[in-house]
Amino acid sequence: MTFSLFGDKFTRHSGITRLMEDLNDGLRSPGAIMLGGGNPAQIPEMNAYFNNLLTEMLESGKVSEALCNYDGPQGKNALLTALADMLRNELGWDIGPQNIALTNGSQSAFFYLFNLFAGRCADGSTRKVLFPLTPEYIGYADSGLEDNLFVSTRPHIELLPEGQFKYHVDFDSLPIGKDTGMICVSRPTN
């Protein structure tokens, strides 16, 4: 089958699919100890809370409502309002439901953000995503619709006792310019 360039890019192996295959293999291997991604440290009390909540939703008919009805394009209004209220009350943020975007997870959220702020622009220029600290999460590597979407800088490496080390952003070497579409600061350690 012949795909478009988009299809070719998104049907080949990528960092995130390899990572997710490894996580899936670990979950299916008896006795494996999950020390990486994929929710490695589930909290029994939270699992019990979610099970109870789902049971209540099932008994009240809310599970069918949640699974079988479409929400608005921005997400479920009740959830957006509750999130905005929580962020205002807990953190003092001047935020409303219109400032919140719900996605299918962080991987798709970063895909949208990277391609919204970086890549080829209408004026012919190209902007990039700057990672001020590397190494970075492998799942980002294939998130651009175009190749060479990302740039990064080497960190300062602080050597610590017992063979440990810590990365620090080298603020003096950050290549921030007109071609910087966004700066992505993340430490996805679950």
Language model: regions and residue ranges:
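Conserved core of the PLP fold type I
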Residues: E65-N190
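N-terminal "arm"/small-domain region of PLP-dependent enzymes with the aminotransferase-like
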Residues: M1-Q74, N89, K166-N190
